[in-house]
């Protein structure tokens, strides 16, 4: 027998990315993560009663990503969940009988699954970067305190405990940067920048001779650089923290990037020849995914200081920030003539939008860019190259003059998500893009877990 407890139009993105359902031990309730409405970028935790079909909103996060991974305690009296912003992920608990939220721990890596121990005293959780790279299992008391890294659980996420048995998923993702010659069927795609870890966020220098990118080959996300043929690898940053999204200045002398090294995500600028990074944003709110104005005077970035992600800009020499978008905005680039700002809206809203740099109303230009691929596009003189995943994932060119789209080529493997993934060479002859070339998963069992 099947019963419908809510209709399709009553929820928004319950199964997207971090979607997880959790049954209460007595089977009367279901906890899940969803958007309260389409105007809220952050997800919240909701509780569905199977007896009354009533839905109760439990959390009201003021972060750009929100709450997910709800997990009932063994006695059903307490709910634990993750809360994530651009800066950090925290573990929270709440007594379902009433009371305030309690934050147990926060950190720069993302939460990948929660599991209560049988006695209800501790919570086991996975901690990792995007796509669960550099993961490990940890344990923390339900009252907070210092977490304990378990002796097992390397590359471990999504733990589950039943009795004295613990199972978890061990996952390894391999993302590499590929190169392809445009407008030529004689040159197939080839792997350009690769390792056994994560290589993403490529961007050509203005003269096309160098490529800046982000990599985890050192153990953490850092900025790296190489020649356009993939040779001459050099590590640019050494923050030992989540650092990425490199963007060249128009004159090629500087690189802007974001880093969580200060505790909250901030925008930095470093000389392309090396040296000490200069912090540009100083607010306590997050600042991520920078890009330069065509004249080099401004750096655009995304910030959640208003309660959701919007595009802001700050003088490249330093100074006060000014808000640019007002209806949500994230990864942004100016048009080649500097008249328009193109932008995607981040993790929860699909499409590419445009607003005049002199001010005005926003207009949706492309609707078929998935929300999870906010960094998989590049603006050129007469259009935009972007990833279309409606059928087989492919790179498509949208001509802004004719408003027509042309399929350029199909991807060999799955595209990477939640990361910048595409750049076009200055001479428009070459495209670099990221692919998820390998994703291995194993189910691991630990006996006699205490």
Positions of predicted regions on the chain:
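Loop/turn-rich, solvent-exposed surfaces of beta-rich toroidal or solenoidal domains
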Residues: 376-396
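Blade-level signature of beta-propeller repeat domains, shared across WD40, Kelch, NHL, RCC1
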Residues: 420-450
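Residue position within the beta-strands of beta-propeller blades
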Residues: 29-33, 78-82, 122-126, 166-169, ...
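Conserved beta-strand position repeated across blades of beta-propeller domains
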Residues: 22, 71, 115, 160, ...
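Residue-level detector of Asp-centered blade-edge/turn motifs that repeat once per structural unit
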Residues: 25-26, 74-75, 118-119, 161-163, ...
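Multi-bladed beta-propeller domains
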Residues: 1-17, 47-68, 83-84, 93-112, ...
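Solenoidal tandem-repeat scaffolds enriched in leucines and small polar residues
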Residues: 16, 23, 33-43, 48, ...
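Structural motif
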Residues: 40-46, 87-92, 132-138, 174-179, ...
């Amino acid at each position: 027998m099947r019963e419908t407890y809510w209709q399709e139009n009553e929820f928004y993105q319950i199964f997207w990315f971090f979607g997880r359902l959790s049954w209460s031990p007595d089977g009367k309730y279901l906890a899940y993560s969803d958007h309260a409405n389409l105007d809220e970028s952050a997800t919240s935790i909701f509780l569905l009663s199977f007896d009354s079909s009533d839905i109760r909103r439990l959390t009201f996060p003021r972060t750009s990503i929100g709450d997910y991974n709800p997990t009932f305690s063994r006695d059903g009296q307490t709910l634990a969940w993750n809360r994530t912003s651009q800066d950090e992920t925290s573990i929270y608990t709440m007594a379902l009988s009433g009371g305030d939220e309690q934050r147990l721990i926060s950190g720069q890596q993302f939460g990948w699954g929660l599991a209560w121990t049988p006695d209800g005293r501790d919570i086991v959780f996975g901690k990792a970067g995007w796509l669960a790279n550099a993961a490990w299992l940890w344990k923390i008391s339900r009252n907070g305190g210092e977490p304990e890294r378990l002796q097992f659980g390397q590359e471990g996420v999504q733990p589950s405990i039943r009795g004295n048995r613990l199972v978890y998923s061990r996952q390894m993702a391999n993302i590499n940067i590929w190169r392809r010659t445009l407008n030529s069927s004689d040159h197939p795609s080839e792997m350009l920048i690769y390792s056994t870890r994560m290589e993403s966020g490529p961007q050509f220098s203005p003269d096309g001779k160098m490529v800046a990118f982000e990599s985890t080959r050192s153990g953490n996300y850092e900025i790296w650089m190489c020649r356009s043929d993939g040779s001459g690898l050099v590590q640019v940053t050494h923050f030992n923290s989540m650092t990425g999204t490199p963007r060249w200045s128009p004159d090629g002398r500087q690189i802007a990037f974001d880093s969580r090294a200060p505790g909250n995500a901030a925008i930095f600028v470093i000389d392309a020849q090396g040296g000490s990074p200069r912090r540009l944003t100083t607010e306590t709110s997050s600042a991520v995914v920078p890009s330069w104005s065509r004249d080099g005077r401004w750096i655009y970035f995304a910030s959640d200081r208003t309660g959701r992600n919007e595009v802001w800009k700050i003088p490249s020499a330093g100074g006060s920030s000014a808000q640019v978008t007002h209806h949500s905005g994230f990864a942004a680039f100016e048009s080649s003539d500097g008249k328009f700002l193109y932008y995607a809206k981040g993790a929860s809203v699909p499409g590419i939008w445009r607003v005049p740099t002199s001010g005005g109303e926003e207009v949706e230009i492309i609707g078929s860019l998935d929300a999870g691929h906010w960094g998989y596009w590049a603006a050129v003189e007469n259009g935009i190259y972007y990833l279309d995943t409606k059928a087989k994932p492919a790179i498509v060119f949208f001509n802004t003059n004719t408003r027509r789209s042309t399929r350029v080529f199909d991807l060999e493997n799955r595209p990477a998500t939640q990361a910048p993934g595409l750049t076009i060479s200055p001479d428009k002859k070459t495209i670099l893009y990221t692919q998820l070339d390998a994703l291995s998963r194993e189910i691991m069992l630990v006996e006699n877990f205490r």
